[in-house]
Amino acid sequence: MELLFCGHDYKYAVEQLMLLMFPEERPEYVEADGGAPSFAEVRLSPEGDFSETLLRLGGKSARGEARLDGAPPSDPLLYKRETQKLVKLSFFRAARELTGVTPPWGALTGIRPGKLAGRFMRQTGLGRDAAAEFIEREYYVSPRRAALCAAAADEAEKLRKSLDKNDISLYIGIPFCPTRCAYCSFVSHSVEKSLKLIAPYLDALQRETAAAGRLAAELGLRVVSDYIGGGTPTT
C-alpha cells in the first residue's frame, strides 16, 4: 500500500494499523498520489488538532477523521501522544469503513493496552467499569477485551500502590529469538543470523547484572521482581 503523509511522520504507528487491517499489504512511502489501486493519504493539521485519512483499495474508497477536543498539549511528549492518536484513529476509521471489520482490540496495537486504562483511572479517579467503557468507546475495543484491559490495569495499580519507594523491578532484555516473526516490534534478531553474538552477549549480561546488583545495594534499593524478555515466549 502506498502511504502519503502530510503534516507528520508517524510511520510506525500507521504501519501497525495497516498490517492489522490489511495483513496482505506492505508499506511503500510516496511523495504524491500516483493513482495506485492501494493507497492511503494520512494528514495532520498544522495546529495538530485534526487528522484525516483518505483510503483507496480494491476499487473502493473511504474517509476517516479524528479531532482533538480543545487545543493540543504544549508538552512535546504529550503533544506527540495526542497527535499520533489522532493519526491512528483517522486511519482506523477509514479502514473500518472500507472493510467493515472491527478487530477485538479495535484500534489498539501496542503490547500494553492496560496502560491506557490505568492512566484513565489515575487521572479521573474512576474505577475499572468506567475505564472499560472509555477504552471501548474511544478505541473501538470489544466489551470483553475492554473489561479485561481495565481489570488488568486495576490489579496493576493495586500492586503499584503496595510497593515501597525503594522497591524496583529489573528488566533483562533478550535480543535473540529462534525466528523473527513478521509482526515483531522488538529489537530482536534470529538465532540463525546472530549465533556468533550470543556468547559475548551472555558474558556482558553477567557483568551488567552484577553491576546493577551492586548499584542497587549502594542506593538502598530492593529488587522485588525480574522480568526477562524482549522476544517471544519460545526464546
Q: How should each PLM-predicted stretch be described?
A:
Residues 94, 112-120, 130-134:
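A general alpha-helix detector
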Residues 190-212, 234-235:
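Canonical radical SAM enzyme core domain
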